[in-house]
A protein has these predicted regions:
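Amphipathic, well-packed alpha-helical segments that form the structural scaffold of globular domains
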Residues: 9, 13, 28, 45, ...
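A compact, surface-exposed functional segment
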Residues: 32-64, 70
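Conserved cytochrome P450 catalytic core segment spanning the I/J/K helices
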Residues: 1-27, 41, 60, 65, ...
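Conserved cytochrome P450 K-helix/beta-meander segment immediately N-terminal to the heme-binding cysteine loop
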Residues: 91-95, 109-137
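Cytochrome P450 catalytic-core helices
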Residues: 22-47, 157-166
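Conserved cytochrome P450 K-helix E-x-x-R motif and the immediately C-terminal K′/meander segment
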Residues: 55-97, 118
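Cytochrome P450 heme-thiolate "Cys pocket" and heme-binding signature region
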Residues: 13, 18, 56-63, 84, ...
Length: 166
C-alpha cells in the first residue's frame, strides 16, 4: 500500500536522524582513537596522501583507501554508534544454552558485547585497524555488526561508509 503523508514524513525523519547522528558519533570516536594512536593515524594519513595528493577525494578512491576504511570499521567495533538500537521479537521459543527465550519476548542484541568478544577480537580494547584489512582472517557473520544484520540491516550502511571515508 501507499504511505499517508504523515507516515511519509515520519519515515523521512527516521532516515535523516538515524543517518546523521550515527555517522557523526562514529566519526567522533574515530577521531578520538586516531588522536590517541598517532602511529595508526600516521598510517592512515600516509595512505590518503599517497592516493589523493592534494586533490579532492571521489568514490573511485574508496578501494584505494583500505587502511582508512579499516580504521573506521575498527572504531565502530570498539564504539558501535547504534549500540542500543538492535532489538528483535522472538517469533518462536528459542533455546540458547540452558536458557529458553519464550516466543514473543523482546531480545536486545548488544553490538558492544559482540564486538568485544576476545574469541574473535584478541585484545578487544586495543585499536587495531589491521583486523579489517583485506588480507585479515574472515570474521564470523555476527561478530561485527555496527549496522545491524539480516533483513533489518541499516539501509544506509554503504552510504555511511562512503560518506565517512570521503
Amino acid at each position: 500500500g501507499r504511505l499517508s503523508e504523515a507516515e511519509l514524513r515520519a519515515q523521512c525523519k527516521v532516515i535523516f536522524l538515524a543517518g546523521f547522528d550515527t555517522s557523526a558519533k562514529a566519526l567522533q570516536w574515530w577521531a578520538w582513537l586516531m588522536a590517541a594512536n598517532p602511529e595508526k593515524a600516521g598510517l592512515a594519513f600516509d595512505e590518503v596522501r599517497q592516493v589523493l595528493g592534494d586533490r579532492t577525494p571521489c568514490a573511485d578512491d574508496l578501494p584505494k583507501l583500505p587502511y582508512l576504511a579499516a580504521s573506521l570499521k575498527e572504531a565502530m567495533r570498539i564504539y558501535p554508534p547504534a549500540a542500543g538500537l538492535l532489538t528483535r521479537r522472538a517469533t518462536a521459543d528459542i533455546k540458547a544454552g540452558s536458557w529458553v527465550i519464550p516466543k514473543g519476548s523482546l531480545v536486545v542484541v548488544a553490538p558492544w558485547v559482540l564486538h568485544h568478544d576476545a574469541r574473535h577480537f584478541p585484545q578487544p580494547d586495543a585499536f587495531r585497524p589491521e583486523r579489517f584489512m583485506p588480507d585479515a582472517p574472515p570474521l564470523p557473520r555476527s561478530a561485527w555488526m555496527p549496522f545491524g544484520l539480516g533483513p533489518r540491516v541499516c539501509i544506509g550502511q554503504h552510504f555511511a561508509m562512503t560518506e565517512m571515508t570521503l
